[in-house]
């Protein structure tokens, strides 16, 4: 049984979502059609935190009861999952590097504001943008992201995400993943393979 563990990006990230639909609700409805075609052969999971995030953007009445049937909400078993010590070491080292990088971004902004006192507001905006990028890009920056990683580890599932931080840490922990930008094509191929398999069985 193939198990996919889904991130919010499929339905919320505009660049990814447009392959499934113009709005989060339309994207979810398209996805659920694929899930229906693959029912019994492929399972789709979401940690509860991720599910709640997605449902902030999706009109529930338009996707019920299918969403309850085809997306399994499951928290990771945080008490029994073992995480290698090297992961903690890498996380600590990554945080240290990011703090140093954030300090350099702040120092640069201070120097610019001293030289150009007339553009302090623009410099602050630039500081916030660069500081956020230095500290958050490519890292697990929320409890929900970590739950996604843990659940995929527990299920030996395949993470589907466009988040660089999630995919980076999936690789570090030996977890299979699919880039969300290619997920629709993956689903289409799975549906086609299932149809061919069923057709061959009928001929026999």
Swiss-Prot record:
Catalytic activity: Endonucleolytic cleavage of RNA, removing 5'-extranucleotides from tRNA precursor
Record's keyword terms, sorted: Endonuclease, Hydrolase, Nuclease, tRNA processing
Domain of life: Archaea
Pfam families attached to this UniProt entry: PIN_5
EC number annotated for this UniProt entry: 3.1.26.5
Protein's UniProt keywords contain Cytoplasm: no
GO function terms (MF aspect): ribonuclease P activity
Keyword Kinase: no
InterPro entries per record: PIN-like_dom_sf, RNA_free_RNase_P
GO terms (BP aspect): tRNA 5'-leader removal
Family membership noted in the UniProt record: Belongs to the HARP family.
NCBIfam families with a match to the protein in the record: PRK04358.1-3 (NF003342), RNA_lig_partner (TIGR03875)
PANTHER family linked: RNA-FREE RIBONUCLEASE P, UPF0278 PROTEIN TK1425
HAMAP family recorded: RNA_free_RNase_P
Role description: RNA-free RNase P that catalyzes the removal of the 5'-leader sequence from pre-tRNA to produce the mature 5'-terminus.
Protein name per the record: RNA-free ribonuclease P
């Amino acid at each position: 049984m193939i198990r996919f563990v889904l991130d919010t990006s499929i339905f919320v990230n505009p660049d990814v979502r447009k392959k499934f639909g113009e709005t989060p609700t339309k994207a979810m409805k398209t996805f659920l059609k694929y899930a229906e075609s693959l029912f019994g052969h492929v399972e789709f999971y979401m940690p509860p935190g991720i599910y709640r995030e997605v449902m902030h953007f999706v009109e529930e009445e338009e996707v019920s009861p299918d969403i309850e049937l085809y997306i399994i909400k499951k928290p990771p078993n945080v008490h029994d999952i073992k995480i290698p010590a090297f992961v903690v070491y890498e996380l600590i080292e990554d945080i240290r590097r990011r703090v140093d990088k954030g300090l350099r971004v702040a120092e640069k902004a201070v120097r610019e504001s001293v030289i150009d006192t007339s553009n302090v507001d623009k410099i602050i905006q630039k500081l916030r943008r660069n500081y956020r990028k230095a500290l958050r890009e490519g890292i697990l920056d929320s409890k929900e992201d970590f739950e996604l990683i843990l659940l995929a580890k527990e299920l030996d599932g395949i993470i589907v995400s466009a988040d660089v931080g999630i995919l980076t840490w999936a690789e570090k922990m030996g977890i299979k993943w699919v880039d969300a930008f290619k997920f629709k094509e993956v689903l289409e191929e799975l549906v086609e393979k299932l149809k061919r398999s069923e057709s061959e069985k009928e001929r026999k």
